[in-house]
C-alpha cells in the first residue's frame, strides 16, 4: 500500500487563514493554537512590561514584542512561529511583517496543552 503524502504548507497558507484563527507553521505543517487564557495574558503583559522597562532603563536598543508577532525561522518559508514574547536586538532581523531568524531572546509561557510543542518542537527550531 502506498504511503499517504502529507501536504506541505507555506506561509502563504498561514496568511490565507481567517483573521481570528491562530496557527503556527513548523516544517510545513500547520499547528492550530487555542486563544490564550486570561492568566496567560496577565503573565505575558507583566513580563513584556518589565523587560521593556529594563531595556529602556539601561539605554538599550532591543525591541520587545508580545504575540501575535511573526517570527520566520527559515528562508524556505515553511516555519513561522509566534513566541509569547520576543526580544530582538539586531535591527537587521526586523521587517514590516516581523522577525527574520531567531530572536535574541524568546519566552514561551507554557501551559499543559502547549508543553510538548514549546519544550520540544519549537525549542529545536530556535
Region spans (language model):
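Gly/Pro/Ser/Thr-rich low-complexity, intrinsically disordered segments predominantly at protein N-termini
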Residues: 1-125
Amino acid at each position: 500500500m502506498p504511503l499517504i503524502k502529507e501536504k506541505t504548507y507555506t506561509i502563504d497558507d498561514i496568511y490565507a487563514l481567517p483573521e481570528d484563527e491562530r496557527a503556527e507553521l513548523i516544517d510545513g505543517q500547520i499547528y492550530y493554537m487555542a486563544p490564550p487564557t486570561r492568566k496567560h495574558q496577565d503573565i505575558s503583559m507583566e513580563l513584556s512590561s518589565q523587560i521593556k522597562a529594563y531595556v529602556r532603563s539601561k539605554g538599550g536598543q532591543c525591541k520587545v514584542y508580545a504575540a501575535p508577532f511573526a517570527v520566520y525561522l527559515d528562508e524556505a518559508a515553511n516555519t513561522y512561529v509566534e513566541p509569547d514574547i520576543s526580544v530582538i536586538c539586531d535591527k537587521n532581523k526586523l521587517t514590516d511583517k516581523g522577525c527574520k531568524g531567531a530572536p535574541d531572546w524568546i519566552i514561551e509561557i507554557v501551559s499543559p496543552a502547549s508543553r510538548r510543542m514549546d519544550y520540544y518542537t519549537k525549542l529545536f527550531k530556535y
